[in-house]
């Protein structure tokens, strides 16, 4: 969970692509020529182009490889997350991947040999898991899809297959919010915060949609600002209930994918569906990187135990194991790995991503082994 983007560090060379109407993706590129393989990076709540600092390290490490890095702007980028949702995110990821596939036809590498890996940071990890585990195409949702509930509704697109998926800092928004409710914040006591959130939940449940479930309602800005969301960000009742997931763990919201108290049955319906959907092509194609010192994760969470449960749900059928060997906890890593105190942790993150991409590519003559991780 991260809702305040970092300031830009320095000018970054690359190409800006319009992959759909009014939606763009930035391709990090310091050299001419098409690279056949693609890492598509999806950032977290409040993030946008260039706001996740460690992405620069990944780009630098892959400079001499056959991989290019794309960072798309989607409807939920920056402040748009408050009225968007995972379904719309994955729709736009699908459109971006379709664009990239067509764009890279000129790379000289046959389509069957070109690789695409999706990587999510924070809430972007929810997008990644939803992309590879949900029905394809997904089911239409009220308030999110134009024409829902009407005869002439527009169906969500079919999502293209991907060769790999990376989740970095996959944390529970619900449990992060619960920590604030238990401790309060610099402005309000825990008692006041609990009242504000409970009132907001009651309002959102009572007034989730209007106009025959075709339009979202918006929670009053003073309420969401008191909780800690940016005062300028409108948050729909639908998205608020999804993030806070008040009926969890029995009936979790769409965004509640990574909480430590979720049942095995819930994990079978998310992680466990990866092997059934057929969207993630490669075995050993899922890399999960959990930060060892993430302030968004409550102290009571058993990180190692949580990862074991996720792996068990994903790889229950040992004949088709998707969990990659580089998955695990990055010791000492914070949520975003920003700052001078996180240099070693960023190196370790880049090393694991670098090794994973080399395995996905599978050709040592042209793979990431020709590039170099941070030294």
UniProtKB/Swiss-Prot annotation:
It comes from Emericella nidulans (strain FGSC A4 / ATCC 38163 / CBS 112.46 / NRRL 194 / M139). Keywords: Hydrolase. Residues 138-158 are annotated as: Disordered. Homodimer. InterPro entries: AB_hydrolase_fold (IPR029058), SidJ (IPR013744). Esterase; part of a cluster that mediates the biosynthesis of a yet undetermined secondary metabolite. With the HR-PKS AN6791, produces a pathway intermediate compound with molecular weight 258. Belongs to the sidJ hydrolase family. Its EC number is 3.1.-.-. It is an enzyme of class 3 (hydrolase). This is Esterase AN6793.
């Amino acid at each position: 969970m991260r809702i305040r983007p970092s300031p830009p560090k320095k000018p970054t060379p690359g190409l800006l692509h319009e992959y759909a109407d009014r939606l763009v993706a930035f391709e990090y590129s310091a050299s001419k020529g098409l690279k056949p393989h693609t890492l598509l990076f999806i950032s977290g709540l409040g993030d946008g182009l260039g706001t996740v600092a460690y992405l620069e390290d990944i780009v630098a490490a892959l400079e001499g490889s056959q991989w290019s890095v794309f960072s798309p702007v989607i409807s939920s980028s920056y402040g748009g997350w408050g009225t968007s949702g995972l379904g719309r995110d994955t729709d736009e990821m699908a459109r971006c991947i379709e664009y990239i596939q067509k764009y890279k036809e000129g790379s000289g590498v046959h389509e069957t040999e070109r690789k695409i890996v999706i990587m999510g940071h924070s809430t972007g990890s929810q997008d990644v898991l939803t992309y590879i585990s949900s029905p394809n195409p997904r089911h239409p949702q009220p308030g999110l899809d134009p024409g829902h509930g009407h005869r002439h509704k527009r169906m969500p697109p079919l999502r293209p297959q991907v060769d790999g998926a990376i989740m970095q800092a996959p944390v529970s928004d619900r449990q992060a919010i619960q920590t604030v409710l238990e401790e309060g914040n610099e402005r309000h006591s825990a008692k006041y915060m609990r009242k504000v959130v409970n009132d907001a939940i009651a309002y959102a449940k009572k007034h989730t949609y209007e106009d025959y479930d075709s339009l979202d309602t918006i929670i009053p800005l003073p309420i969401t600002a008191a909780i800690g969301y940016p005062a300028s960000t409108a948050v729909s009742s639908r998205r608020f209930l999804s993030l806070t997931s008040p009926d969890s763990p029995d009936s979790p919201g769409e965004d509640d994918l990574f909480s430590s108290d979720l049942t095995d049955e819930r994990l079978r319906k998310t992680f466990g569906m990866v092997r059934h959907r057929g969207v993630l092509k490669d075995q050993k194609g899922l890399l999960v990187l959990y930060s060892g010192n993430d302030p968004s994760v409550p102290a009571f969470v058993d990180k190692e135990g949580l990862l074991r449960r996720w792996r068990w749900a994903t790889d229950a059928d040992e004949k088709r194991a998707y969990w990659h060997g580089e998955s695990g906890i990055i010791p000492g890593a914070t949520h975003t790995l920003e700052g001078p105190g996180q240099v070693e942790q960023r190196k370790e993150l880049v090393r694991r991503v670098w090794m994973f991409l080399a395995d996905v590519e599978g050709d040592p003559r042209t793979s990431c082994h020709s590039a170099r991780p941070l030294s």
